[in-house]
């Protein structure tokens, strides 16, 4: 009888269906059965593999996790308070020092989510920070040549001119928009910033400053002061807003001490906090600024590279604001990742923020996974080498990557493959090419017997990525390149042949140059400059290209903000600074985050432990 109430549905009899209707119903049913049966082939073939990927259900993080983060004693373990309050003074006696110590202990042990107003207003002493810098932000170091050789000086000025041209084109045609479209000479907002504007402005701040483009920097600063508003109501990518906006603002503050950058960064960081309102504390990838929640219309999984690339920014937000909630959020992410089972020590790319279990069996050092590993080693360096947890996680992950993903092609090219449930895809993405620089960056702090090995490995991976550029007609690298069917370091599909002004390869050149002083990396960087000038420069800015194997490629009509923030900064990193004394080659760049922005090291944010 129910079927008779469906509009437009009239069965042949009160109790039956017409033959065509029966056929459609059976067709639907058979398709459903086929789909369910086919899904069985995607499941692990053994219970052992299932145990590797599907962690047993554990109690959802709640008060117990908050207590541990805040440094409170856990009741079930009956541990004494780390700093017990002093005994109460005898009646009638007044002990101001004891009362002061007790208040201090209460402040340390009270959960930060319910803290009362601080008695003393928080302030960050920028002048004290600046006085502790080991090297000047601009200019040369003591004992270094004021002027490099003429060829290097000309290269430096050329890259600065490229930055000026990219900025002036953006300012003329798209000022205030997120990115420039150079072919149509207009701006592009996109839908991943939740209504925020000016991504190129904020992403470019530190590059303009470091290149000593003073007029352009003042233009960017004025726009931030007057036009960068946070009263937006869209849905934004947590990852993109963090690395482009918050990262750019933090870098600008550390370089200049201008309060506008600090204040904007903190306020924007507060707007991202609802993304962490999940059962595990693993944030959703999309946050709704309108509803102040993290359950926007995105899918059910969180991506490793996204929730794993928040640590640096959020620790600095805590340091600059005095609000411990930022640090607590990212330390909770670390806690979840420490506890969960990892297949062969590898970190899959997708994690459920609800259950805390891995969702898929895909492991990649390229897209979806890349910056997680980068943030581990940089967290170690930025903590003035005190964050032992980050150090251990990084070297353990690197060992697993080398054991299960690293390959050498028949031509002798070293590459990092992708892993899908035990089966390797013999390809390497452009995003994975940052790993050469990352491994070089971490080689110094590896075990003594591994240091030379890691330096050689970094050089070999960087050479492979250079080959992906050298084997194209434009001398620019594809989005992904393969090692099969007799072809090596080339894209095999047109859909992977594009180049969107990405920085990862030149970042590795920069790190290897600063560490080894081998001029080959400077030469490779200059090859990229020439290729960008020939194939990506247009009348009104720089544009990505659709096919690197076409000597006259079509443009994609987009000047990415990271081209100014990362690619050009990494290129000038090879030639702008005078050649440093051997042994200090990468010190000035060791704190570059994923968007290649310089930050302070030795973050003084207190790190709560079980003993506090």
Residue map of PLM features:
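Cytosolic juxtamembrane regulatory segments of membrane proteins
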Residues: 51-63
